[in-house]
């Protein structure tokens, strides 16, 4: 099971008493701000949660798994996430739900 933006909105609606529309807009604005920061090359630091960083990957040789043909994998920029210590310890100490 995955946590969705709709579930986040519903949680804000229930816990904070926001209207469903405002809760949905708040979630959308949060993710849009994270996207905007990353598009502008900025690091996103969420205290107690973790950091989103950008990393440039160089071009490298690759291979088509079907044909075995050598193909170059182009240079690109990727988003990485590094969990913070608080998040790591909470996840490590959580009991798995089935």
Swiss-Prot record:
It holds the Pfam family Bac_DNA_binding. GO terms for cellular component: cytosol. CDD domains: IHF_A. One of its GO terms (molecular function) is structural constituent of chromatin. Residues 49-71 are annotated as: Disordered. InterPro entries: Hist_DNA-bd, Histone-like_DNA-bd_CS, IHF-like_DNA-bd_dom_sf, IHF_alpha. One of its GO terms (biological process) is regulation of translation. It comes from the Bacteria. The keyword Nucleotide-binding does not apply. Keywords: DNA recombination, DNA-binding, Transcription, Transcription regulation, Translation regulation. Belongs to the bacterial histone-like protein family. Heterodimer of an alpha and a beta chain. This protein is one of the two subunits of integration host factor, a specific DNA-binding protein that functions in genetic recombination as well as in transcriptional and translational control. This is Integration host factor subunit alpha.
């Amino acid at each position: 099971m995955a946590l969705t933006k709709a579930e986040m909105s519903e949680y804000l609606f229930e816990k904070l008493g926001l209207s469903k529309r405002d809760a949905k807009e708040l979630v959308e604005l949060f993710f849009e701000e994270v996207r905007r920061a990353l598009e502008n090359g900025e690091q996103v630091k969420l205290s107690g949660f973790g950091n989103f960083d950008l990393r440039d990957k160089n071009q490298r040789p690759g291979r088509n798994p079907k044909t075995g043909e050598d193909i170059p994998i182009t240079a690109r920029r990727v988003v990485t996430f590094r969990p913070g210590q608080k998040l790591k310890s909470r996840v490590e100490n959580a009991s798995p739900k089935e």
